[in-house]
UniProtKB/Swiss-Prot annotation:
Protein name: Threonine--tRNA ligase catalytic subunit
Assigned protein family: Belongs to the class-II aminoacyl-tRNA synthetase family.
Residue intervals passing through the bilayer: none
MF terms (GO), sorted A to Z: ATP binding; metal ion binding; threonine-tRNA ligase activity; tRNA binding
Cofactor(s) the protein needs: Zn(2+)
PANTHER family: THREONINE--TRNA LIGASE, CHLOROPLASTIC_MITOCHONDRIAL 2, THREONINE-TRNA LIGASE
Alphabetized Pfam families for the sequence: HGTP_anticodon, tRNA-synt_2b
Function: Catalyzes the attachment of threonine to tRNA(Thr) in a two-step reaction: L-threonine is first activated by ATP to form Thr-AMP and then transferred to the acceptor end of tRNA(Thr). Also activates L-serine and transfers it to tRNA(Thr) but cannot deacylate incorrectly charged amino acid; unlike most archaea the editing function is found in a freestanding protein.
Length: 541
């Protein structure tokens, strides 16, 4: 898709200028995750058919400057940093919607795609049809996980109870990982004085994505990242070489004011939660720390089913513009390189693509739609310890500067949930599923036993509900599959008399006559192990 974005933007410009020539007023052009968009001022909604007449190639002469397209004196706002390219001859309008950026303004948003060849378009539309079956926004609405609302603002998600269950499971798992690695969990405020961001450098380099405001003669900023606050905790007391490494973790909410045309469900939001971690350590501790981080990251990704060729590791080295001494960069890069070699994992070296403050290791994963996503990162930082004058007392009593490592395994918790929903098509591993068992009594006569089965499961901490509706059993089974419930338990007169259950699982698997106690024990084992592969069906089937 990345290779098409220049074409899409060119197509959007062409289509917008066609509209302008027809007397319409396009005001903004940009790119979404899978298409382009054009916002048009209009007192009434354009129809799909009306908009399609503007979807054709024309070689307009225009100028792009300062984020605007200028054509015959008319200026249209251009969002994003992609360069328009190519000569798209094939257009497709995907949908049209109306939104109100303010009380007195109505805009019609047209979304579409554009390609140079019909083959490109046909291939993409086929891919898009498949992708729509796995669109996390559609799955999230169907499963009642989360929602977005005009009243709350674009890019700001509201997680519903079942969505919060998924978040809690992922956070609990990461808490266990952090505890096993010696992290101390902290909490930091969402708002800080901008003096903090000026020291860190974010005020100059990241200000366009920050929310900054004045209050009581002070300038404040909502945090786009957690690291400066963790640094202040480190600085709150004298640190000895014996204390290092010091590891802080936080499930921190951060806010980055992305352009509205770039927002896309949970994949690109303005507020999200990071599984953030920062380690302060001596240079001689860097290699062992990174080795442990790489191992744990691969373990976590594997727990979600991403392993082998579906994980790609990148080592990014020193860019032309950087801070830190040659010796520091050489030591840090060698440490990261040695770790990857000693662990015998395949990796790709990306020359000069490291951060300006240090080398890094990134982990990409491939989902069921063959898309690659950058998730986890391990970044060495020489910059912030220098800016904040961090110190520790060395063995000889001298003061030394620690190295800092930034680490996130999920990256964005929200984005990770979106990827998992699309990868599993809503059928999450049992331990992550909001509802793990749904009990289906064959008739009202079996309702008492169904309630007893549910009570036994709930007492073991298994998320269970009953569907006692008067609909047919086949309809209730289908609804359970559609809702992504891993296990449907069917109980009738025979099951009640024998203290057994009939299990219906994903893949239309049915196992009859399973003792209730065994089902509960095996399911507890599957959930407790967070095992997406060795399910109870494989053990008792």
């Amino acid at each position: 898709m990345e290779s098409y974005r220049g074409l899409w933007l060119k197509g959007a410009i062409v289509m917008a200028l066609n509209m302008y020539e027809a007397g319409l007023t396009p005001v903004e052009i940009g790119l979404g995750e899978r298409d382009f968009y054009i916002d048009v001022q209009s007192d009434s909604a354009l129809s799909l058919q009306e908009s399609e007449k503007f979807a054709q190639w024309k070689d307009h002469k225009y100028e792009i400057k300062d984020g605007k397209v200028t054509y015959n004196g008319k200026q249209i706002l251009l969002q994003g940093d992609v360069t328009p390219s190519g000569e798209p001859r094939y257009f497709k309008v995907l949908n049209i919607s109306v939104h109100h950026p303010s009380a007195n303004v109505q805009l019609v948003r047209i979304r579409g795609i554009a390609f140079e060849t019909k083959e490109q378009m046909d291939d993409y539309l086929q891919w898009l049809e498949k992708a729509s079956e796995t669109d996390h926004r559609i799955i999230g609405e169907r499963m009642d996980l989360f929602s977005f609302h005009e009243e709350s603002g674009p890019g700001l998600v509201l997680f519903h109870p079942k969505g919060q269950l998924i978040r809690n499971e992922m956070i609990n798992y990461m808490r266990e990982i952090n505890a096993s690695m010696g992290y101390q969990e902290v909490y930091t405020s969402h708002v800080f004085r901008t003096v903090l961001w000026k020291i860190s450098g974010h005020y100059d380099t990241y200000r366009d994505k920050m929310l900054i405001f004045q209050k009581d003669d002070d300038e404040l900023g909502i945090k786009p990242m957690n690291c400066p606050a963790h640094i202040l905790i480190y600085k709150s007391r004298v640190r000895s070489y014996r204390d290092l490494p010091i590891r802080f973790s936080e499930f921190g909410n951060v806010y980055r004011w992305e352009k509205k045309g770039e927002l896309y469900g949970l994949l690109r939001t303005r507020g999200f939660t990071q599984d953030d971690g920062h380690i302060f350590l001596r240079e001689d501790q860097l290699k062992d720390e990174v080795k442990n981080l790489v191992r744990k990251t691969l373990d976590v990704l594997g727990k979600f089913g991403f392993k082998g060729e579906d994980v790609r590791i990148n080592l990014s080295t020193r860019p032309d513009e950087s801070i830190g001494s040659d010796e520091q960069w050489e030591k840090a890069t060698k440490a990261l390189l040695d770790v990857l070699k000693e662990l015998n994992v395949p990796y790709v070296v990306k020359e000069k693509e490291g951060a300006f403050y240090g080398p890094k290791i990134d982990f990409d994963i491939r989902d069921s739609l063959n898309r690659w996503w950058q998730l986890s990162t391990i970044q060495v930082d020489f910059n912030l310890p220098e800016r904040f004058k961090l110190e520790y007392v060395d063995e000889d009593g001298s003061k030394k500067r620690p190295v800092m490592v930034h680490r996130a395994i999920y990256g964005s918790l929200d984005r990770m949930i979106a990827i998992l929903l699309e990868h599993f098509r809503g059928k999450l591993p049992t331990w992550l599923s909001p509802v793990q068992v749904r009990v289906l009594p064959i008739s009202e006569d079996n309702l008492d036993y169904a309630k007893r089965v549910m009570d036994v499961l709930v007492q073991r901490g298994i998320r269970t509900e009953i569907d006692p509706s008067g609909e047919t059993l086949s309809k209730r089974i289908k609804r359970g599959y559609d809702d992504g419930v891993p296990y449907l338990v069917i109980v009738g007169r025979k099951e009640a008399s024998e203290e057994k259950v009939t299990i219906r699982a994903r893949g239309n698997v049915e196992i009859k006559g399973v003792p209730l106690s065994r089902f509960v024990d095996e399911l507890s084992l599957e959930i407790g192990n967070r095992d997406a592969e060795n399910t109870l069906i494989k053990r008792i089937g």
